[in-house]
């Protein structure tokens, strides 16, 4: 069944209104007809609907069943990703959305090779947001994770400062028991910030700055993970702990 997102104000007592690019997708790409069923989510409720009317700029669907969204992790997770090379960011966004991340913040770190210019930055962000939406639909998410504009490392640490847990996977972190202890300490309703370095990793100064903000450097094991793998690994472990 096809999955679509709306804002809460687009849901009435007995019907929902779908607007924007999804209208064209429903009508001209999927070629759906009146009476066909779709799944619609407003971030907290999931609606089983049947298409009632197809207009030029709006699709109206009759609500047949309402249930609480159950696909979201009970803790809000924000991934701060050091800007990687090539198209790796697209893979990171797609897979981390599937694994339950709520926000992704691209971060310019000292060892980042890629430098986004101002003209390309917004176009990139829009593409990344579209990838997030597509992955959220595929995964049956209850919301579309936000892809933030590029931040400096200082800005990222400031944004993360109010989170209950700030985790920094680091290949030189000691105490192999730490990840289990730290992840098990995360409780439903708490917010978690995860910082992932770019291909070259973190500089020691960046780790020190993060620790000064309350972050805990953790190891992900005896093997060094690629930047596009590390965030997924932490999310998978967090998901296991939170949904156990």
Sequence positions of predicted segments:
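Generic structural signal for residues in well-ordered beta-strands
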Residues: 61, 144-148, 217
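Mobile, glycine- and charge-enriched loop segments
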Residues: 38, 62, 71-80, 183-188
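N-terminal positively charged helical leader segments and presequences
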Residues: 1-68
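Short, hinge-like loop/turn segments at secondary-structure boundaries
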Residues: 121-125, 185, 236-237
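Residue-level signal for inorganic ion chemistry
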Residues: 35, 96, 132, 210, ...
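Active-site/ligand-binding-proximal alpha/beta "capping" segment
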Residues: 163-201, 206, 215-218
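Structured adenosyl-cofactor binding patch, chiefly the S-adenosyl-L-methionine
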Residues: 203-244
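RNA substrate-binding interface of SAM-dependent RNA methyltransferases
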Residues: 70-168
